[in-house]
UniProtKB/Swiss-Prot annotation:
This is Truncated transcription factor CAULIFLOWER D. The keyword Protein biosynthesis does not apply. Residues 90-148 form the K-box domain. GO terms for biological process: cell differentiation; flower development; positive regulation of transcription by RNA polymerase II. Gene3D superfamilies: Transcription factor, MADS-box. The lineage of its organism: Eukaryota, Viridiplantae, Streptophyta, Embryophyta, Tracheophyta. The gene is CAL-D. GO terms for molecular function: DNA-binding transcription factor activity; protein dimerization activity; RNA polymerase II transcription regulatory region sequence-specific DNA binding. Residues 1-61 form the MADS-box domain.
Length: 148
């Protein structure tokens, strides 16, 4: 006996909606991990809950590298498709604004992580990278203190 198809509409019951979100998010993250392993693909996934909580997965050690690569790729694609120079210039400024805004948001997120905030939304791999970065910074600070 198989499951029936679920009608694609918003789930009205708040508790059922949250349970469904959690289960489907976990399934989506698992699928992203599986495709990265099985197909040796570079996979990144970003999910925001209805409350704005961030959930992410990256097969690379650093989501920032993947996002920068995506920005470069999409920028190059748009350059090839924009024939009008005026429109092209406007698009360049718009894209640059979007790119810088995303970079600022990323830096703010990283700063919160360095301060120990919003750590529940990041993966174990990212926590290990954060720990390594903080250890490196502490070593650098201690070595500078010894020199003075």
């Amino acid at each position: 006996m198989g499951r029936g198809r679920v009608e694609m509409k918003r789930i009205e019951n708040k508790i059922n909606r949250q349970v469904t979100f959690s289960k489907r998010r976990a399934g989506l993250l698992k699928k992203a991990h599986e495709i990265s392993i099985l197909c040796d693909a570079e996979v990144s996934l970003i999910v925001f809950s209805h409350k704005g909580k961030l959930f992410e997965y990256s097969s690379e050690s650093c989501m920032e590298k993947v996002l920068e690569r995506y920005e470069r790729y999409s920028y190059a694609e748009k350059q090839l498709k924009a024939p009008d120079s005026h429109v092209n210039a406007q698009t360049n400024w718009s894209m640059e604004y979007s790119r810088l805004k995303a970079k600022i948001e990323l830096w703010e997120r990283n700063q919160r992580h360095y301060l120990g905030e919003d750590l529940e939304s990041i993966s174990i791999k990212e926590l290990q990278n954060l720990e390594q970065q903080l250890d490196t910074s502490l070593k650098h600070i201690r070595s500078r203190k010894v020199c003075k």
